[in-house]
Regions:
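Non-ligating segments of multi-cofactor redox enzymes
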Residues: 1-61, 65, 71-74, 80-185
């Protein structure tokens, strides 16, 4: 008995005071994702990278909104979302306690206004994403604020309409070249 007490005093506590004191985790621990909708541009990079499909993004054309959703019950804490996010809107925290009374508490959502194409009216991207792209071009020095605003209709044109416009423009150039070559002969 004395031997057991001697060993117990020598090695101290074998357990931690976890519920009473917060438990220290490794600095590289990947816990609950923390999402900041103010920083998010709704680009969808995180939803494409998520292997567990814990992140989803749905566009409602009638409402003109894009809804981002995180289902914590599906998250495998791989940090792919954090790696691909261009604005650092989602980060994995040190928090590991995720027990909830209500299953709906495992869901996080955010809504974003969707930009509709200036030519066909189809929704295609979040307005915040377009504004972010324009701001990046201004910040890089490729455009001034005024030039960016002048080109806003180009930014707010969907890829399909841009493709159609380029094909039409390309056909005119080809026709012009053909006529020029015939006139020269």
């Amino acid at each position: 008995m004395l031997k057991l007490l001697k060993t117990a005093f020598k090695h101290r506590n074998a357990t931690v005071a976890y519920p009473a004191k917060p438990m220290q985790v490794d600095p590289n621990f990947r816990g609950k994702p923390e999402y900041n909708p103010e920083q998010c541009i709704a680009c969808g990079a995180c939803t494409a990278a998520c292997p567990a499909n814990a992140l989803t993004m749905e566009t409602d054309a009638r409402e003109g909104t894009r809804t981002w959703a995180l289902h914590l019950g599906r998250c495998i804490f791989c940090a792919r979302c954090e790696e691909v996010c261009p604005t650092a809107a989602i980060k994995l925290s040190q928090e590991f306690e995720m027990a909830v009374w209500n299953k709906s508490d495992l869901f996080q959502t955010a809504e974003f206004k969707v930009c509709s194409c200036v030519e066909c009216g189809a929704p295609y991207a979040a307005q915040k994403e377009i504004n972010y792209a324009m701001a990046l071009l201004v910040q890089a020095g490729n455009l001034t604020e005024e030039q960016a605003e002048e080109r806003r209709p180009q930014f707010e044109t969907c890829p399909n309409c841009k493709r159609k416009n380029n094909i039409t423009h390309s056909a005119r150039i080809t026709l012009g070249r053909h006529l020029t070559q015939e006139a020269a002969q």
